[in-house]
Amino acid sequence: DKIPGQVTASALEERGMQAMISAWYAPQGDLISNEEVKGWVDEYPEQFYGMCSVDLRDPVQAVKVIRQAVQQDGFKAVRIVQWLWELPCSHALYYPVLATCVELDVPICLQVGHTGPLRSSETGRPAHIERIALDFPDLKIVCGHIGYPWHVEMICVATKFPNVYIDTSAYKVKRYPAELVQYMKSNGKQKVMFGTNFPMIMPDAALEGFEQLGLDDETAQLFLAGNAERVFKL
């Protein structure tokens, strides 16, 4: 069953949080439509920002959808879940989407690392992120789910390219790899963003043990809010 927008908005409001909420499109159709996301954002503008998604099989229509979502409906990013399509982000079908993100100056949000469902993890390898970062140097790329078991490679890609970022969605604090925490404390303090993967992980559970990371005040603020505010222009 779908989680009602009111439940999500209330959970965020109680904790003084805001969230990006994403549409999901797959070959079988929309799992969460752009229209649903727009409805939630319109109803709870203090809690939600929208991310649109598209059908990769129709690149011309995908470009039209993105332009409307960003220019008319105020969406802040585009999200594609690569394993749903069984195509890495370096595949040609993504390129009209990526070019449109550059044109409109909005980030593309992708998943890196292994897949939870029984689907190939090949689409989540950071090498595909490197390929599109080379081809689209002005494209802002937000890589969700940390990238495990290739998280060190993901950190290298984020370090190499100024517009590549990592978010921690789907991981509780206690599961953050040590290499990621060290990156956050050093040259990666402006490159890592907090995420939850709500409702799979609730905000309180995602942040449990946060103080044990030992982040200074500046780094903690950037991680929890500042980096996302800057990259997504919130």
Question: Language-model features: where?
Answer:
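Mid-to-C-terminal alpha-helical segments outside catalytic/metal-binding sites
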Residues: 1-18, 67-68, 186-193, 201-234
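Conserved, mostly hydrophobic/aromatic
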Residues: 12, 37, 41, 69, ...
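Hydrophobic faces of well-ordered beta-strands that scaffold small-molecule active sites
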Residues: 19-22, 49-52, 76-80, 108-110, ...
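Structural recognition of alpha->loop->beta junctions
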Residues: 71-76, 127-143, 161-167
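Active-site gating/metal-coordination segments in enzymes
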Residues: 18, 27-110, 114-123, 174
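Helix C-cap/helix->beta junction micro-motif
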Residues: 15, 44, 103-104, 136-137, ...
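A general structural detector for well-ordered alpha-helical segments in enzyme core domains, enriched
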Residues: 7-11, 33-40, 65-69, 93-97, ...
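Active-site-adjacent C-terminal substructures of enzyme catalytic domains
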Residues: 140, 147-206, 212-218
